[in-house]
């Protein structure tokens, strides 16, 4: 047991070192700070390396309690992957091929949240390798946000990683990556699933750098995102502040951590 823990710790150090050498990941915290709060980080998904970068760019005290949500079919396919996801990343595995009658796939995520852990989630559900915008969000984000109102919902835009590790490749290319951490998404009382997921998608798209090819969904006056330009304010009908850390815009420089992968 002690030997496994030692190997996992050393492997984690090596992974963070390689990630920094290859991509020099730069976390930018805007409207949110890297503080010890229970959170659900939701991000765009273009590579198996996505959650590794989030995991790498979280400070150690946050990384220790932040677990990526990942596809069991991929991460259980070999002894090495099992070691990485279980012992190094402490991942939460979900069965993406669930058949009728099988347990609720969100049960393991609820168990992790009930235990006080934060999660890294990719609401698109699979890797998105084109430049046509985000895929439709899966409903899991909505259900977890509804059932755990105390957990902050932090969008994270990962820029450039699809060029560092394209789908099907195993050798990364040395390119710089930026991770934009945005302000927590507010809950709006009575908001239905479709409206919530559309608003979460817009919040994530808004973090994409200028010039990125990320088409926005059409927004009508009735579904426009709430005004969160005033720090500390709440939106009409909201039960959670739109910005839990008013006015903060911080670049964190130490290790940090990540979310769901396939």
Where are each of the predicted segments found?
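Helix-to-loop junction immediately C-terminal to a conserved catalytic motif
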Residues: 15-45
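Intrinsically disordered, low-complexity terminal tails and inter-domain linkers enriched
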Residues: 212-261
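Catalytic core of membrane glycerolipid acyltransferases/transacylases, capturing the structured
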Residues: 35-97
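A charged, well-structured terminal subsegment
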Residues: 106-107, 111, 177-200, 205, ...
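Residue-level preference for the first positions of well-ordered beta-strands
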Residues: 38-40, 118-122, 154
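A cross-family acyltransferase "interaction/gating" segment
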Residues: 129-194
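Internal catalytic-core helix/loop-beta-alpha segment
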Residues: 92-136
């Amino acid at each position: 047991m002690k030997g496994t823990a030692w190997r996992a710790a050393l492997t984690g150090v090596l992974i963070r070192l390689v990630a920094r050498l290859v991509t020099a990941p730069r976390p930018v915290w805007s409207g949110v700070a890297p503080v010890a709060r229970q959170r659900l980080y939701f991000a765009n998904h273009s590579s198996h390396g996505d959650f590794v970068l989030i995991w790498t760019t979280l400070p150690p005290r946050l990384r220790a309690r932040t677990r990526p949500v990942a596809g069991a079919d991929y991460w259980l396919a070999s002894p090495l992957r099992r070691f990485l996801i279980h012992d190094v990343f402490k991942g939460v595995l979900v069965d993406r091929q669930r058949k009728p009658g099988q347990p609720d796939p969100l049960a393991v995520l609820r168990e992790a949240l009930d235990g006080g852990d934060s999660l890294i989630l990719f609401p698109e559900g699979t890797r998105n390798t084109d430049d046509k915008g985000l895929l439709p969000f899966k409903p899991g984000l909505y259900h977890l946000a509804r059932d755990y109102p105390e957990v902050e919902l932090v969008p994270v835009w990962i820029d450039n990683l699809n060029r560092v590790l394209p789908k099907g490749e195993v050798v990364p290319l040395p390119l710089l990556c930026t991770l934009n951490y945005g302000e927590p998404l507010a809950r709006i009382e009575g908001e239905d699933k479709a409206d919530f997921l559309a608003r979460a998608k817009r919040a994530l798209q808004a973090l994409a750098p200028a010039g990125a090819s990320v088409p926005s969904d059409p927004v009508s006056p009735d579904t426009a995102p709430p005004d969160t330009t005033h720090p500390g304010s709440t939106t009409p009908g909201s039960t959670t502040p739109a910005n839990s850390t008013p006015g903060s815009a911080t670049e964190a420089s130490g290790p940090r951590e990540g979310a769901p992968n396939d």
